Amino acid sequence: MIDFDDVAAINPELLQLLPLHPKDNLPLQENVTIQKQKRRSVNSKIPAPKESLRTRSTRMSTVSELRVTAQENDMEVELPAAANTRKQFSVPPTHPRPSCPAVAEIPSRMVSEEVEEQVHSIRGSSSANPVNSVRRKSCIVKEVEKMKNKREEKKAQNSEMRMKRAQEYDSSFPNWEFARMIKEFRATLECHPLTMTDPIEEHRICVCVRKRPLNKQELAKKEIDVISIPSKCLLLVHEPKLKVDLTKYLENQAFCFDFAFDETASNEVVYRFTARPLVQTIFEGGKATCFAYGQTGSGKTHTMGGDLSGKAQNASKGIYAMASRDVFLLKNQPCYRKLGLEVYVTFFEIYNGKLFDLLNKKAKLRVLEDGKQQVQVVGLQEHLVNSADDVIKMIDMGSACRTSGQTFANSNSSRSHACFQILLRAKGRMHGKFSLVDLAGNERGADTSSADRQTRMEGAEINKSLLALKECIRALGQNKAHTPFRESKLTQVLRDSFIGENSRTCMIATISPGISSCEYTLNTLRYADRVKELSPHSGPSGEQLIQMETEEMEACSNGALIPGNLSKEEEELSSQMSSFNEAMTQIRELEERAVEELKEIIQQGPDWLELSEMTEQPDYDLETFVNKAEFALAQQAKHFSALRDVIKALRLAMQLEEQASRQISSKKRPQ
């Protein structure tokens, strides 16, 4: 056994810490060579032990035990540390044998080689694991490596998830990423749709929204549904958006109404919660109005008139027919039978600011106000009906005559407001009136500006009447003393529906679910939401009402841009839209004046005919003939001069309208 105390006593310099030499910082291979030479010079002074003689197997077992112990102590191989390690170890032989008398002592060279082998084994083991022995990692480096590994794992997981999602959705499918995001969002919703068993709440102003399913054209284009209705009064619009870096995301906008009908709701369900509560009102001597409002092609005519199959319509499944059936059911009840009520119906349309009777070969009607400030529709025929079947026949007759045309969004769009009225009369006097209005499809002015003049005039008149309708509903909801019903022919005709304490109104906003109609859908919902938030149930503050009053125009009704916080290009477009609307108003006024002057000229026709007949008599008075001719010419000259001036002004207004339309088309914002 080696006694290191004796070794230290003989060589005290071994216990001294040697300063590091600059060469110790050399690379590992060169450093090992230098240290090996130093150890040889130092270890050569160690004497051999005198107690016992060890064989080669004993030396090998000692070296192996030293190697294992060095690994357990992290093998920090520094020269002073190695010396301390050698000092602490006392390794007994594995197989002790008696000392051999033939050998007196072990040469010092053998001991030196043995120690050298032990140190070299420790050096070798430390060089085999240089990370732990030479450079130990700090905590910061370890944390950075952990974060890097987690990041790589997260990237791999995301890549795997994207691959799985891509397999679920066809990558060639347009907007498939938006479809996936909408599907994931809907998975988090708890849906409780409206059912026939839900209670009906009565409102003076009831605003509902109805979503139609995707039609054949939208399915052929592989459009996605961006509308969700999770509950009976809540609607969500998943508006697709793009960030600056072209990252796609959804902006989910929520709207709350009295009732919200999804694509599975039938006309019967819609009627039960919208128009049916209003039938009782007209039997109580009131006025009721039900509007269907929305983008062209969103399902207004289907809701009001019934199922459509091409141009044919099943009127028995529309709100018109359902309301008439309930009217006759209530009329036959004992409490109302004694009143002796008679049921009359009228059906007319308002097209481009003019009224036409759909039940009288589209005869043109005139709207006048009598001395009692009551609006009268001159020439409108009222038809007596005795059953719901008679009403359906009238509806079929009038619907076949209604004006329609091709627009940006619908090839067979209703371009007029159709008003079907159910009148209750008791002994010739008006007892109650129910007006069911299928409004024309609203479109933005920027979309109709590139069409022909007739389409532009249609769109301008439609938007003007819708804006006036909103103002009248606002006055009704706030119980204002003044109702601005003179702003359009539509509100003039429905004036008595907006005044009086016993007046009730219901609006059904119909929307399209396709992604291409998202902007139009938002415009419709904002219009309907404005009507609802102005009702007494929501109770806006006075500051909000003042802000609503000062707004110049609703984006959802006419599509014009609201001044303020706009770019220079948008301000120019807004100014041009204002000029376009002014030109349209001027054209409409001049047109009416020209028609009046022409009628005056035609009325002078009998005078000329009388003069012609006078000349056929053999003894007519020439003096009388000349006097009458001069008088007729003077009258005709006055009317012709007035007509000529009106026609010139009309031509100028048409040129201004054409110029404004071209400017709008050239600067129209990209969609």
Swiss-Prot record:
Which intervals of the chain are annotated as region Disordered? 36-62
What's one GO MF term for it? microtubule motor activity
Under the heading PANTHER family, the entry gives: KINESIN-LIKE PROTEIN KIF2C, KINESIN-RELATED PROTEIN 6
Primary location recorded for the protein, binned into one broad class:
cytoplasm
Record protein name field = Kinesin-like protein KIF2C
**Stored CDD domains:** KISc_KIF2_like
Residues in Kinesin motor domain copies: 204-534
Q: Keywords for this entry?
A: ATP-binding, Cell cycle, Cell division, Centromere, Chromosome, Chromosome partition, Coiled coil, Cytoplasm, Cytoskeleton, Disulfide bond, Kinetochore, Microtubule, Mitosis, Nucleotide-binding, Nucleus, Phosphoprotein, Ubl conjugation
According to the UniProt record, where is the region Negative regulator of microtubule-binding? 153-184
What is any one of the record's Gene Ontology cellular component terms? microtubule plus-end
Question: Which cysteine pairs are joined by S-S bonds?
Answer: C191-C233, C290-C506
Residues involved in ATP binding? G294, Q295, T296, G297, S298, G299, K300, T301
Q: Which organism is it from?
A: Macaca fascicularis (Crab-eating macaque)
Q: Which domain of life is it from?
A: Eukaryota
Motif stretch (Microtubule tip localization signal): 44-47
| Record-listed Phosphoserine modification sites | S41, S52, S57, S61, S112, S121, S133, S138, S465, S567, S579
| SUPFAM superfamilies membership | P-loop containing nucleoside triphosphate hydrolases
- In residue numbers, the region (Globular) covers 1-200
Q: Which Pfam families match?
A: Kinesin
PROSITE patterns, from UniProt? KINESIN_MOTOR_1 (PS00411), KINESIN_MOTOR_2 (PS50067)
